[in-house]
């Protein structure tokens, strides 16, 4: 399970709440990974990927609007980071899911959680300092 920690707080309620939601989506993947009652997880994996992509696009748009409103000088670079995340999610090879569903979920979660944590702790922290 992926736990929200105080160190992820930026002090901007709207952004912090949206970041928490990204953790919640990742936790759906974790719960699916640990659920031994689903023999075929393909549809659930696809649901999580779609939700992750759609919510990330929403969040990134909101965050970029906020950054524009405060005149953040590194907005373009920050947007490129967001774009790379979306491209990676879009590149998840859905044909590979069926070969080893749990392995696929784990690899997907490793990428998503690492990216989100690093992005919040490094890139997002830059605009509040």
Curated annotation (Swiss-Prot):
PROSITE patterns: HEMERYTHRINS (PS00550)
Gene3D superfamilies linked to this entry: Hemerythrin-like
Residues annotated to bind Fe cation 2: 63, 78, 82, 119, 124
Keyword tags: Iron, Metal-binding, Oxygen transport, Transport
CDD domains xref list: Hemerythrin
Family annotation (Pfam families): Hemerythrin
MF terms in GO: iron ion binding; oxygen carrier activity
SUPFAM superfamilies: Hemerythrin-like
Stored InterPro entries: Bacteriohemerythrin-like (IPR023504), Haemerythrin_Fe_BS (IPR016131), Hemerythrin (IPR050669), Hemerythrin-like (IPR012312), Hemerythrin-like_sf (IPR035938), Hemerythrin_metal-bd (IPR012827)
Binding-site residues, Fe cation 1: 19, 59, 63, 124
HAMAP family linked to this entry: Hemerythrin
Protein purpose: Oxygen-binding protein. May be involved in a storage mechanism or for delivery to oxygen-requiring enzymes. The oxygen-binding site contains two iron atoms.
Quaternary data: Monomer.
Family statement: Belongs to the hemerythrin family.
Protein's recorded name: Bacteriohemerythrin
Lineage: Bacteria, Bacillati, Bacillota, Clostridia, Eubacteriales
